[in-house]
From Swiss-Prot:
Biological role: Kinase that can phosphorylate various inositol polyphosphate such as Ins(3,4,5,6)P4 or Ins(1,3,4)P3. Phosphorylates Ins(3,4,5,6)P4 to form InsP5. This reaction is thought to have regulatory importance, since Ins(3,4,5,6)P4 is an inhibitor of plasma membrane Ca(2+)-activated Cl(-) channels, while Ins(1,3,4,5,6)P5 is not. Also phosphorylates Ins(1,3,4)P3 or a racemic mixture of Ins(1,4,6)P3 and Ins(3,4,6)P3 to form InsP4. Ins(1,3,4,6)P4 is an essential molecule in the hexakisphosphate (InsP6) pathway. Plays a role in seed coat development and lipid polyester barrier formation.
ATP-grasp domain location: 178-384
Domain of life: Eukaryota
Organism (species): Arabidopsis thaliana (Mouse-ear cress)
MF (Gene Ontology): ATP binding; inositol-1,3,4-trisphosphate 5-kinase activity; inositol-1,3,4-trisphosphate 6-kinase activity; inositol-3,4,5,6-tetrakisphosphate 1-kinase activity; magnesium ion binding
Gene: ITPK2
Name of the molecule in the record: Inositol-tetrakisphosphate 1-kinase 2
Length: 391
């Protein structure tokens, strides 16, 4: 079989006669107009336009003359990209939506599930490995694969991911980011780690200069719902109700709005989410104990269309975000992450980073599918240019 040809003005009978093909000829209208290609099994089959079909009218195929097809230059430069993925079932369901897979296929990007029961090096070949699995064993598998296949882009390196799964190391180095020339100031809330005996940590909290109320977060992010549970501790005695290991972070009033900054390579998208309301001095004096609050980053908590005070709702300045993300990509060594930011209440451009997440819930982001298709296309172009340079 020589390939699948797109239907056009040429009649099937004339194709059969000129090419000497009988039942082996497949005729299809194609479905990949953007790249003019179809994917069948493991083969990319070129879509042929009217110009090329006219040229083929002059081709005579017989037993001694093999059929050859020369792709136009613009088709030769558009490369197929195979993305092997290793995701939890929940992440696969939320990320690999039908629309994403359809748009990707139209651009020559194909997602292939990695079989966790087989050696990774025996699978593929892959151009990109996209993963979000926890555990030392998987981390070792990916690191070994990277050493054996340096030509494959791994999103993202396990060592870099591990750093932000620990809330103590997650925000380290933020103070050293070079943002002095930007239209905003960046801080991290004062925090401390409690490894055991939360009740006995009350004195350490005072010594560290932290002021109540405190946001309490589990130290480790392990993919469970419990690792994302957040509490607000109003006084010293309430610390005894918390289970270590955990991070205690000073609560910063921020008008009840949080900014989720999504990063996909060089692309930045920002969404507003409802968060905890401000805590007044009067409330601090009257309220005690621990308050467990829901995950304020949930899709239901979107504040993008809410009627908010403009001083609270105004997004962080674009130059500030661009500089911050550029520095963080370098510091963290990640390309897929999001930043949870708040603006200090009463200020215009004083911001705090309170959390960083690897490979977050992009499915909540409008038009995330096109963002990722563009991202993978860029990876394909970079790989193509590297191959051309090495020739």
């Amino acid at each position: 079989m020589f390939g699948t040809l797109a239907s056009g003005e040429i009649e099937t009978a004339r194709l059969n006669r000129n090419l000497g093909i009988t039942s082996n000829l497949g005729v299809s209208c194609g479905g990949f107009e953007d790249f003019a290609m179809r994917f069948e099994g493991e083969n990319m089959v070129p879509y042929k336009g009217e110009e090329q079909e006219e040229e083929e009218d002059q081709v005579v195929v017989n037993e001694t003359t093999p059929f050859q097809f020369q792709q136009p230059l613009f088709l030769q430069q558009q490369q197929k990209l195979v993305v092997g993925y290793a995701l939890t079932s929940k992440k696969k369901k939320s990320f690999l939506q039908p629309k994403l897979e359809l748009l990707a296929r139209r651009k020559g990007i194909f997602f292939v599930a990695i079989d966790l029961n087989r050696p990774l090096s025996e699978q593929g070949p892959f151009d990109v490995v996209l993963h979000k699995l926890l555990g030392k064993e998987w981390e070792e598998v990916i690191e070994d694969y990277q050493q054996k296949h340096p030509e494959v882009t791994v999103l993202d390196p396990p060592g870099s991911i591990q750093r932000i799964y620990n809330r103590q190391s997650m925000l380290q180095g933020m103070a050293d980011l070079k943002l002095s020339d930007c239209s905003g100031s960046l801080f991290v809330p004062k925090q401390m780690v409690v490894l055991k005996d939360s009740a006995a940590s009350a004195d350490a909290v005072v010594e560290a200069g932290l002021k109540f109320p405190l946001v309490a977060k589990p130290l480790w992010i392990d993919g469970t719902a419990k690792s994302h549970q957040l509490y607000l501790a109003y006084d010293r005695r309430s610390l005894a109700e918390l289970d270590p290991p955990l991070v205690l972070q000073e609560f910063v009033n921020h008008g009840g709005v949080m900014f989720k900054v999504f990063v996909v390579g060089d692309v930045i998208k920002v969404m507003r989410r409802f968060s905890l309301p401000n805590v007044s001095n009067c409330e601090k004096a009257k309220v005690d104990g621990v308050f467990q609050f829901p995950r304020v980053s949930s899709a239901a908590a979107s504040a993008d269309n809410a009627d908010l005070d403009p001083r609270v709702a105004e997004l962080p300045p674009k130059p500030f975000l661009e500089a911050l993300v550029k520095e963080l990509r370098s510091l963290l060594g990640l390309r897929l992450f999001n930043i949870d930011m708040i603006r200090e209440h009463g200020s215009k451009n004083v911001f705090y980073v309170i959390d960083i997440n690897y490979f977050p819930g992009y499915g909540k982001l409008p038009d995330y599918e096109q963002v990722f298709v563009d991202f993978f296309q860029n990876l394909a172009q970079v790989k193509y240019k590297k191959r051309q340079h090495c020739k």
